[in-house]
Amino acid sequence: AAAAGGAIGVLTDALPRDGEGEGSGFGVCGPDVIVVRDSLVALQRLASWNRQQSAALCVGVTGSVGKTTTRQMIHAVLGEQWSVLQSPANYNNEIGVPLTLLELGPAHGAAVLELGAGRVGDIRFLCGLAHPEWGVITRVSACHLESFGDLSAVQATKQELVEAIPGSGCVFLNADQAEVCAMSRATSARVVYFGYQAEGSGRCALRGVEGGRIRFCS
C-alpha cells in the first residue's frame, strides 16, 4: 500500500514473506526499505533526532479540554512573526507527535504541538521527544478516568509538561483552576497565568460575537 501510494521509502519491522509482496512495488525499482526491530521506536527516535537539529521554539499544549483550539490560537499569534509548524488534526500521541516532528524543517521558527495522554507517563515521554521550551495547560477535568483512576492522576499527568520545561522556558497556566495553578510549584521556569482571575497577567474577557467572529478584550 505504501509503494502504491507513492512512498519513496519504507520503515518496517516485518518484510513480506515470499509471495506476499507480489505486486506491492517492493523490489529493485521499488522504494528503499529499512528494516528495524521495532518500527514505532525507530519512528520516535528519528523524530527526536530531527527535533534536535532544529532551533525552532517548541510549544507544548495539554489539558483535558481545549487543546486544539488553544493550539490553533497560538499558531495564529506566532505565525505573525515566524513560519510555524503545528500538529495536524489531533496528532497528539506516541505516533502523531513523532510524525509532526518529522515535518519540522529549517524554515520553521516555531512548532506548536498538542500533547495527549491515555495514562500516567505519556506526557513525559512525548516531552522527551519534542523538548518543549514553553508549556500551556488548559484545564484538568475528570476525563478518561477509566485509565487514570481519579482526578489527581490526571493532574499529575498534565503536570509532566510543566516539569519538562527548562528553567529558561515559560509555563502558561489557567488561573481559574486551582489544580492547574498548583503546578507552578513544579517548575523553575517563568510562570504566566491566563484566565479571568489572572490579574496582571493574561486576563481576557469575551467582548461579543460580531459577524461570526469572537472578539476579546484584555
Give the predicted meaning of each segment.
Residues 3, 12, 16-30, 136-218:
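Acidic, Mg2+-coordinating active-site environments of NTP-dependent enzymes
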Residues 34, 85, 192:
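General small-molecule cofactor/ligand-binding pocket signal
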